[in-house]
Amino acid sequence: MGSDVRDMNALLPPVSTLSGNSSCSMPVSSSGQWAPVLDFPPGAPYSSLPPHSFIKQEPTWNPDPHEDQCLSAFTVHFSGQFTGTAGACRYGAFGAPTPSQATTGQARMFPNSPYLSNCLDNQQGMRNQGYSAVAFDGTPSYGHTPSHHTAQFTNHSFKHEDPMGQQTSLGEQQYSVPPPVYGCHTPTDSCTGSQALLLRTPYNSDNLYQMTSQLECMTWNQMNLGSSLKSHGTSYENDSHSTPMLYSCGGQYRIHTHGVFRGIQDVRRVPGVTPAIVRSSTEANEKRPFMCAYPGCNKRYFKLSHLQMHSRKHTGEKPYQCDFKDCERRFSRSDQLKRHQRRHTGIKPFQCKTCQRKFSRSDHLKTHTRTHTGEKPFSCRWPSCQKKFARSDELVRHHNMHQRNMTKLQLAL
């Protein structure tokens, strides 16, 4: 299966034919292409949504979305203000909408993108596809589900939850929520207070980072959902009371990740989501079991907290701010903030045992100590040069000298 990316049309499960001979089946395209999948007017409240969210269509995928190896679960917790409004987007049969469904005068961001049929309102057939659930608190009740439904989400504080069961606080970072893929006019009257996002993606661990652009905003309707994620369980369970009806939303959200998988423990970076954890059963006893999954970065760490701090280099998150007057500098790590604040206070807690000189940073003391011991751990690697230095910056300057001399020699020749 590799790391191919499915067309969202192939990811939606097949549904039975309804009265009126309408059908919601979505075929796979016959050739690979990039295609927009949104249908939103350019005006508020969607003006902040990125207009360039695309999903690669690959004909190499089998159109059957029910492959066992794809049934892994992944949840992304959203918190933030719900800005979607009923009637903001259009729905209809796939292709052009029927005249009764079309809204006159409404501009489409992507004129050629598909419409979503309202067949989900009446669909009663069992849908046997593994889903990934995404919840957000559009109202103060996080992950709320109406009382007449089976609870799909339980209340959670917004903390990072690593796949092995640890719960460690992770600084909140704002991202633009990926735009919904399809949308319809309004939810049912009985479900107006229950918004959620559903990631309709069967996948394996190889293509996991592709998924966030495939989010859909939904409300829960009393219909059948054959395989649903229940309370962050490790496998899918049948739930005959809850099936989502599409609904549109947008805005800025605070994103958290929580991996829940069948057979593997694997969370990889997805666009717009904080780089998370990669940890498989074969790595459980390794010295550094936590590996960064940001594309191109495979650094490993002994502790989960160290990986979380490292991840902020990729996200740019700086949750620690200096509280001194007129200083608004921010840092990604608490020790960096503490070290910075010593500039304001003048505190120098590190003292040389030989000469009693004090320093505000331990690395400065370590470098200074070499002046007493004569240690020179930094060696020049230039051919035929054996010089050593006590400080790394001295080695850099020395190396630059070699480079300048080489340049002059080349120009002379």
Swiss-Prot record:
InterPro entries: Wilms_tumour_N, Znf_C2H2_sf, Znf_C2H2_type. There is a cross-link at K56, K159 (Glycyl lysine isopeptide (Lys-Gly) (interchain with G-Cter in SUMO)). Residues 334-348, 360-368 are annotated as: Important for interaction with target DNA. PROSITE patterns: ZINC_FINGER_C2H2_1, ZINC_FINGER_C2H2_2. It comes from the Eukaryota. A motif (9aaTAD) lies at residues 218-226. GO terms for molecular function: double-stranded methylated DNA binding; hemi-methylated DNA-binding; RNA binding; sequence-specific DNA binding; zinc ion binding. Disulfide bonds: none annotated. Transcription factor required for development of the vascular component of the pronephric kidney, the glomus; may repress tubule-specific gene expression in the portion of the pronephros fated to form the glomus. Recognizes and binds to the DNA sequence 5'-GCG(T/G)GGGCG-3'. Inhibits Wnt-signaling during embryonic development. Belongs to the EGR C2H2-type zinc-finger protein family. GO terms for cellular component: cytoplasm; nuclear speck. Pfam families: WT1, zf-C2H2. Binds to DNA motifs with the sequence 5'-GCG(T/G)GGGCG-3' via its C2H2-type zinc fingers. Starting from the N-terminus, the second zinc finger binds to the 3'-GCG motif, the middle zinc finger interacts with the central TGG motif, and the C-terminal zinc finger binds to the 5'-GCG motif. Binds double-stranded target DNA, irrespective of the cytosine methylation status. Has reduced affinity for target DNA where the cytosines have been oxidized to 5-hydroxymethylcytosine, 5-formylcytosine or 5-carboxylcytosine. The 9aaTAD motif is a transactivation domain present in a large number of yeast and animal transcription factors. One of its GO terms (biological process) is glomus development. Keywords: Cytoplasm, Developmental protein, DNA-binding, Isopeptide bond, Metal-binding, Nucleus, Repeat, RNA-binding, Transcription, Transcription regulation, Tumor suppressor, Ubl conjugation, Wnt signaling pathway, Zinc, Zinc-finger. It comes from Xenopus tropicalis (Western clawed frog). It is found in: Nucleus; Cytoplasm; Nucleus speckle. This is Wilms tumor protein homolog. A zinc finger (C2H2-type) spans 290-314, 320-344, 350-372, 378-402. The gene is wt1. The record marks K388, E394 as: Important for interaction with target DNA.
